[in-house]
Design a protein with these regions (language model features):
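Oxyanion-binding/catalytic loops of NTP- or PPi-dependent enzymes
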Residues: 1-65, 69-75, 84, 91-377, ...
Length: 383
């Protein structure tokens, strides 16, 4: 998602050919066609079933690692794949605004470490962008929510994205955004729910036919797309039908998969994933020296938080109803635009005080990290 500032207000920039949520969502998917053409975003996602071996998804979890993607006998780093997504976002934004874009504020999960943050900056450079600031996603969401809010509030931001989960507790006081604590899990998100649903469907098919669809890339991608679609539908309905004709064929003939999903069954399957979110939430409150229920406002961020079962679980964990006037899909990009406006001097009287999510230290003999509380900032220190 990308946004810019117009008249002091953040505005979402739609992707050029996007169909996801009216073009206001940009899938971080990169693919290479048989002819070697590179496609990014919605077009890449749409062709994934027919070209799974040359389609890259979920690269965010690999940022800052030595992981390499092998496509058509060429190796790509996570930074290079991420840069391809940023290049497409940059091109769409330039086409929409009619100006060249050279600088950007980029958001990252709050619990990203230094390697992951530097990798994000490197991706921006490869894409032709000077990264003016890296800002934590929950903090950006709070900026979007609290820009025009007067008074003093303590806010908990729960950000459940596709691949990561972050919890940030902050104080908002008439334009001052002071982060008290942050916690998270960089390997927990909506993707894990999709995987759980895929496993459920694959196990059903295997039980009936003796075939594991997970062993076939194309069949697995069809399962994933169907699971994701059902998950979204069941946020608004109580029943969804998965119908995948000709998902397999062998000497005995074609085989189909049809299954009626209820919201109750969905909640049962994804429940263990949601339960894992409780630990980072408790840690954030512990670091803030607060108890659940002490906060005045709760903001939910990220696509999976549109699910009623996620909303109910998070409200139970925190002990307070979530705010309903926040768009969980767009507020992070809008917050990044606000931060860009602050840096450019277009927005006044906004002060952001964030913390280090991880402890800083020095490596001593034997590859041991030594933390010096007198000279080096410790975990949860304001910077």
């Amino acid at each position: 998602r990308q946004a810019y500032l117009e008249g002091g207000r953040p505005v979402i920039i739609p992707s050029a050919e996007g169909s996801t949520f009216g073009g206001k969502m940009f899938p971080s998917v990169v693919a290479f066609t048989k002819d070697g053409e590179r496609i990014v975003g919605d077009p890449a996602k749409r062709q994934a079933v027919l070209n799974p071996e040359n389609t890259i998804m979920h690269i965010k979890r690999k940022m800052g690692t030595k992981h390499r993607v092998n496509i058509k006998k060429k190796k790509y780093s996570p930074e290079e794949i991420s840069a391809m997504v940023l290049q497409k976002i940059k091109a769409d934004s330039e086409a929409h605004l009619g100006v060249d874009i050279e600088k950007a504020v980029i958001t990252v999960p709050a619990y990203f470490n230094d390697n992951q943050r530097q990798a994000t900056i490197d991706a921006g450079k490869i894409a032709g962008l000077k990264v003016e600031r890296i800002i934590n996603e929950p903090t950006a969401a709070a900026l979007a929510y609290g820009l025009d809010k007067e008074g003093e509030y303590t806010v908990a931001v729960l950000d459940l994205g596709g691949g990561t989960f972050d919890v940030t507790i902050m104080e908002m006081d008439n334009g001052v955004f002071d982060v008290i604590s942050t916690s998270g899990d960089n390997n927990l998100g909506g993707t894990d729910m999709d995987d759980a649903l895929v496993d459920y469907l694959a196990d059903l098919f295997k039980e009936e036919n003796g075939i594991d669809l997970r062993d076939d890339q194309a069949a697995r991608q069809r399962l994933h797309d169907a699971a994701e679609k059902a998950k979204i539908e069941l946020s608004n309905t109580l029943k969804s039908t998965i119908n995948l004709p000709y998902i397999w064929s062998d000497s005995s003939g074609p085989k189909h998969l049809e299954h009626d999903f209820t919201r109750a069954k969905l909640e049962d399957i994804v429940g263990p994933v949601i339960a894992k979110c409780e630990k980072p939430i408790k840690q954030a409150f512990k670091d803030a020296k607060m108890k659940p229920g002490d906060v005045d406002k709760v903001i939910l961020v990220g696509g999976p938080t549109r699910m009623p079962t996620v909303q109910e679980a998070f409200e139970k964990f925190v002990g307070r109803k979530a705010e309903r006037g926040v768009d969980p899909m767009q507020c992070v990009a809008m917050g990044a635009a606000i931060q860009a406006g602050v840096l450019a001097g277009d927005i006044k009287d906004v002060v952001l005080l964030d913390v280090t999510p991880l402890t800083l230290g020095i490596e001593t003999e034997g590859s041991v990290m030594t933390v010096s509380y007198t000279h080096l900032r410790a975990h949860e220190t304001v910077v």
